Amino acid sequence: MVLIRVLANLLILQLSYAQKSSELVIGGDECNINEHRFLVALYDVSSGDFRGSGALINPEWVLTAAHCETEEMKLQFGLHSKRVPNKDKQTRVSKEKFFCESNKNYTKWNKDIMLIKLNRPVKNSTHIAPLSLPSNPPSVGSVCRIMGWGTLSDTEMILPDVPHCANINLLNYSDCQAAYPELPAKSRTLCAGILEGGKDTCSGDSGGPLICNGTFQGIASWGSTLCGYVREPGSYTKVFDHLDWIQSIIAGNTNVTCPL
């Protein structure tokens, strides 16, 4: 998942950023097959294209980033190797999708979140289990785990057969503001990465979970075009700030609005 930058990248002076429509972990290693029972692989039904990842939060619901959305989505659970699937792999399709706003009017720093209701529940198994929602917000300095089937390089699309994982740090929001001047004064996002560079989510990792001190705290949203670049951390939708919206939707209150 995490990208190790070559020396040439360190000489690049351009500071640019772009949404990670599907990101991969740079600088990481293959995830342990038993550490990501909640990780979901997302595909576009019509094209078969891989769209990113999500997290199973209960047997009927998946939480991911809004920009991973396609008209009809296929979701695979219990997946590690794409070529040699686990025997307990399960496949579902999206029944309903919910966004903070009906017109999907999210931005890079706000409302990049989507709830997917499955066409039928998945069953817990050796490689499938939901991830609990947070009961408290994360603390700056926390060690956070990122994971996904995203590209292993930011210079070419190299999608791995298995998910990669890496550890990064939860940073101050001001660290992201310094890297990306367009960011507003306040945002319902988390800033996370390694300021020295070398580890990051990248294309193909979008929608995957940011797990801080063992708790689901963020959703991979966007970051630098040069994944893992020095002082260009990533931005993650803050799950804790959207708990009321998430829980209300699941309870059947589809008229609930996201926090401002």
UniProtKB/Swiss-Prot annotation:
One of its GO terms (cellular component) is secretory granule. Residues 1-18 form the signal peptide. Expressed by the venom gland. Glycans are attached at N105, N124, N172, N213, N255. Disulfide bonds join C31-C165, C100-C258, C144-C212, C176-C191, C202-C227. CDD domains: Tryp_SPc. PROSITE patterns: TRYPSIN_DOM (PS50240), TRYPSIN_HIS (PS00134), TRYPSIN_SER (PS00135). The keyword Signal applies. Keywords: Disulfide bond, Glycoprotein, Hemostasis impairing toxin, Hydrolase, Protease, Secreted, Serine protease, Signal, Toxin, Zymogen. GO terms for molecular function: serine-type endopeptidase activity; toxin activity. Residues 25-251 form the Peptidase S1 domain. The active site is at H67 (charge relay system), D112 (charge relay system), S206 (charge relay system). Gene3D superfamilies: Trypsin-like serine proteases. GO terms for biological process: proteolysis. It is found in: Secreted. Its EC number is 3.4.21.-. Residues 19-24 form a propeptide. It holds the Pfam family Trypsin. Belongs to the peptidase S1 family. Snake venom subfamily. Monomer. Snake venom serine protease that may act in the hemostasis system of the prey. This is Snake venom serine protease KN5. The lineage of its organism: Eukaryota, Metazoa, Chordata, Craniata, Vertebrata.
